[in-house]
Swiss-Prot record:
Enzyme Commission code: 3.6.4.13
Family matches, as InterPro entries: DEAD/DEAH_box_helicase_dom, Helicase_ATP-bd, Helicase_C-like, P-loop_NTPase, RNA_helicase_DEAD_Q_motif
GO biological process, one term: mRNA splicing, via spliceosome
Keyword Disulfide bond listed: no
Stored PROSITE patterns: HELICASE_ATP_BIND_1, HELICASE_CTER, Q_MOTIF
Biological source species: Dictyostelium discoideum (Social amoeba)
Functional summary from the UniProt entry: Probable ATP-dependent RNA helicase which may be involved in mRNA splicing.
Gene field: helB2
Enzymatic class: hydrolase
Protein name: ATP-dependent RNA helicase ddx23
Amino acid sequence: MDPPKLTFISKRDTKKKDEVNKEQPTKNLKILDLFSNDEEFSNPTQEEPTNTLQEKLMNVDPLEFFSKGGLKEEQKKERDDHRDDYRDSRDRDRDYRDNGGRDRDRDYRDGGGGGGGRDRDRNRDRDRDRDRDYRDGGGGRDRYRDNDRYRDTDRYRDNDRRDGSGSGSSRRRDERRENSGRRDYRDNDRRDDRRDNGRYGRDNDNSGGGGSGKNSSDKKEEINPVSNNNDIHKDRIKRDTTQFSHKVFEQINNKRDREDPELRDIKVDYMGIKRDENRKKIKGEKGKFVFEWDSSEDTSSDYNTLYTKKLEIQPQFGHGNFGGYEKNNNNNGNHYNGNIYNNNNNNNNNNNNNNNINNNNNGSMIGGKQISELPDTHWSKKPLKSMTKRDWHIFKEDFNISTKGGIAPNPIRTWQESNLPREILEAIRQLGYEKPSPIQMQSIPISLTGRDILGIAETGSGKTCAFVIPMLIYISKQPRLTKDTEADGPYALVMAPTRELVQQIEKETRNFAQHFGFRVVSLVGGQSIEDQAYQVSKGCEIIIATPGRLNDCLEKRYLVLNQCNYIVLDEADMMIDLGFEPQVTSVLDAMPSSFLKSEDDEMAEKQESDRSHIYRTTILFSATMPPLVEKLSKKYLRRPCTITIGEAGKVVDRIRQTVIFVKSENDKKEHLTQLIKDGPPPPIIIFVNKKKHCDIIAPVLEECRVSYTILHSGRSQEQREAALEGFKKRKYEVLIATGVASRGIHVDGVTHVINFDIPKNIEDYTHRIGRTGRAGSAGLASSFITDKDVEIMYDLKQILTSTNNIVPIELLKHPSSQQKHGSSKDHNKSVIFK
């Protein structure tokens, strides 16, 4: 067995270590002063009364201090107590051993055994080993300690055997077992002290107590023996230090509750103590919605006076002839009691007058409420300058206006607040437009900024006026046309899908343009192209045309668009459906591309604000947004602002829809006769899918003695114009038409629309019934449907359900109404290819 390696410590290191130990008590007092109680902080007799807790904490780190074992004075005192306990225990063991030796000698003499002889042999061997170790140079002290340990083990083993043969052995053995766990580390530490010969105490006290002559301070070098139990000793010191640190922190935490909140926060932040962030949140606190406005802008107060001003009642205990009240009682405690009686009395006397409400008076109604019933904080009772962002948001919600595509200017509330030119306001007054429609409210201010617009609005929403007014304002800012500039073409161009719609837009535009002195020319089929070319050659500011005739004029060089930078596409979805996409594309390509804005949104925004240069403005209006229209808008519109009024393709709620399931054409005639006789009074529009069906309906109307006219593509342009004009002037009570009259034809006062032949798609159905219920009036739409009309059944059922109209039982249970036509696949059928 190799002897353990020796570690030598020089005298200089020992001296340096002693100096550190002398400074240690001062540091201990300093750090303990940091955690003194509040009375010490407030004591005016201290040496440093001006020092605050923050200044002391800045100089000393408590965690670093405790990790380095700075509190050795307390540990030393605890060691002294352990050493005193060890001395007392050693004396008790010696007395016990002496008494036990005498007992063993007595037992041996009495013939009890040879225990005493073994003790004498063991003591003799121990003395011999000790003499040999000292003679060899003191290096055998480790073996001496090992022998002592083995000797103690043998002694306890002998005691166990001896106790097993004597009285009370089980009691003493149980006590040793109970005390064994408590004696483990303490006995080992005491043996460490004995092995080190008081080394631990001398290092801290600078005194050599309990050592041999070789450990005196006169020697230049001294020996530091290595022990296998040093790890246990270090672990215990570390554990004691950690426990002491926790006690100090517990004292700090207890004192934190009594301290000033500011000082507590300073301590917590400096010492890195984590706050209790896992606070139990109140139910509903996490997802609680917080409004962006304060309570002063709240417009959600009840409109009913019974809730805004509570009725305070003093009970009369059954007295009174009107619900417990006396009508002549003037008791001030009962508010409104006289008014309740008087109001009910007046209501009973004037029942007929109160029931006749004028629903067409839209000027006094907002969101289904009378303006007088609205609170004072409502936007309708605020001046324009007092409107907040929230007010504009509510304004758009009231009129079902939504925009996207960047920041859009605020809509106009009234014509008086619009700041439009005097000529426009005069034309509006003459035409009798009391207030703008939702599409006009939002479209006009956006168009005046020069932005492109993609407008989606229901039929009969006033889209014509929405693009005519900004178009005229744009032209008014351009130089007047001369004989030299007239050859370069018009300033503005409007395209519509049908002749009737073109003529209607022309009439509407002339009503406004005459106040500016602008000239308007229409180009439609069915008329002489030479006569139209002659009108264009004389010069005009605005051209309104169908795509086909306009493209013919461009190809024959009757017209050029060199200075046309304002273009409107009305009813774009219908133009695409009628197959005018090539003509529309050809016309747009004929316009100068140098005036087209950049495709980059940032650059296009800068170009819109540049008033020194003219850029093209494109406005596209449509009732629906099919893929082809969306493709067209992406190609020719730059940074457009999308305006949606209501929902795309949605039927207005003012139209009541009825669907009649019929079995044959004869059933249609019978139901048509009944609708003409028992239905709303004229004017009435009857739609058919084929021109020959007009001849089928004519005899039925003659039997009902109703005047009628026919409008379809097979008639000449003069006949079509005469038919439409006669129907508008009430010369004819019924108009029989094909799909040409379903888009954009506005006839005032149409009360009833009858679909003798229901269309194949829901879009055409929407536009047909949109001829009634215009300008805020109510309307009725009746449709005949057969088993062959499977293409529209699913969509028709959906639109009837969404508008709270009655769905006939035949349509509700029909297989084609359960899923969209063309989307089902019969998986039960198998196809075998040969």
